[in-house]
Amino acid sequence: MKYCFLFFYILYALHGHSQAISLKQYIDSAKLRSPLLRGYESQILQLQIDSAIFQATLRPQMAFISNDFYAPVIKGYGYDEVITNKAQLSGLLQVSRNFLHSGAIAAQYRNLALQSQALRDTIQLSVRDLAKTITDQYISAYGDLLSVNYTKDLYELLKNEEIALKKLAQSNVIKQTEYLAFMVTLQQQELNYLQAQIQYNSNYLALNYMAGISDTSITSIAEPLLDGSQPPVLINSVFSRQYITDSLRIQNERRLIDYSYKPQIGAYADGGINSSLQYLPYKNLGFSVGFSLRIPIYDGGQKKLRYQRLDIEEQNRIYNRTYLLTKYQQQITALTRQLQSTESLFQKIKTQVDYTRTLIEAYGKLLQTGDVKITDVITAITNFLNAENTFRLNTVSRLRIQSELNYFNQ
């Protein structure tokens, strides 16, 4: 039969590995290989370096400063010596330091810490999004695997009866047309099995691709273990915490604005040579000390505008948080009701699958003696396939609802 080779090839490929891969393994692999998460983690490391750089700017800064020139006057032509002193030789070692208000220093460190926290919140949200994407694909593949297992069991069950029916047809115990009807059903079930295998292989390889796994061999996956029984709690979750971080950041930016308008003091000391080379330049060795003072007086209204900008940002933050809370409650309520409805049907559908399977097995025994009509067997097979498909769809639906609930409750 032209499908036999493909059938046994897919069967071998599917069971090429004995150990099923779990959902957690796929999620861990995706997190490990995600360039997006790696980029966020690199930004956190960069912020740590920025904090060290800021700390270094608070220490005394040392520099060597040299300004040297010579302005000759040739036949009365040249720069005015009163202005230029004709020449200058300057070589100074300068030490300077800016003295910031302790509150300004703390606010700057706080700003870097809040940026780091915002990145951590983003990482957690990205991890949830990534885990949900992998979970959704895993559930799709698992639903296909259920179809593979059901169609495989039914195919093997019918295949075992083929020889007995053939003998009954040759002995005229059953009609040749009934035997042909059975063979058509058997071949159709074989096609269903092969189609289920192909669909599973496609979703399985897509799952590997999304998780960053380069292995193209096909193996089974384990049943996803999801628990959507506990209602998610939004308080203290990353969805709520990101708005808390934004609020703290806005408050801290107000402090930074305030401190930027406070007086700023700097001090310096230098020593070296600073000479016009006009008279005893070796005596021009010396040192100096000084300080600088900056007091903002008027900035054209920039401070007020910067406050207004932060006010708009805070209003938008409050609106987004309120919107999230409202949508969250609506979504959780809807998902909880869907899960309850799905659970109530689950056991009934499972019982129907078991009944139809038992009926087919009973018909299989009767087929060996020709005591059952082939049409009844075909009807039972059709009922089994319908029940199995309903069970698979209900299983996938339940897993997807649990995945949605887990997304908010991790």
Region spans (language model):
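Bacterial Sec-pathway N-terminal export signals of envelope proteins
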Residues: 18-61, 173-175, 208-253, 336, ...
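Periplasmic alpha-helical coiled-coil/stalk elements that build and connect Gram-negative outer-membrane
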Residues: 49, 121, 127-241, 335-338, ...
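Bacterial Sec-dependent N-terminal signal peptides
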Residues: 1-34, 405-410
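Surface positions of alpha-helical coiled-coils, especially the charged/polar e/g heptad sites
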Residues: 22, 29, 36, 87, ...
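A glycine-/polar-enriched beta->alpha junction
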Residues: 28-38, 48-60, 92-110, 121-128, ...
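Transmembrane beta-barrel architecture of outer-membrane proteins
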Residues: 88-90, 136, 181, 264, ...
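Amphipathic alpha-helical coiled-coil segments
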Residues: 39-54, 126, 130-151, 167, ...
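Small/polar (Gly/Ser/Thr/Ala-rich) solvent-exposed segments
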Residues: 61-86, 96-125, 260-287, 294-308, ...
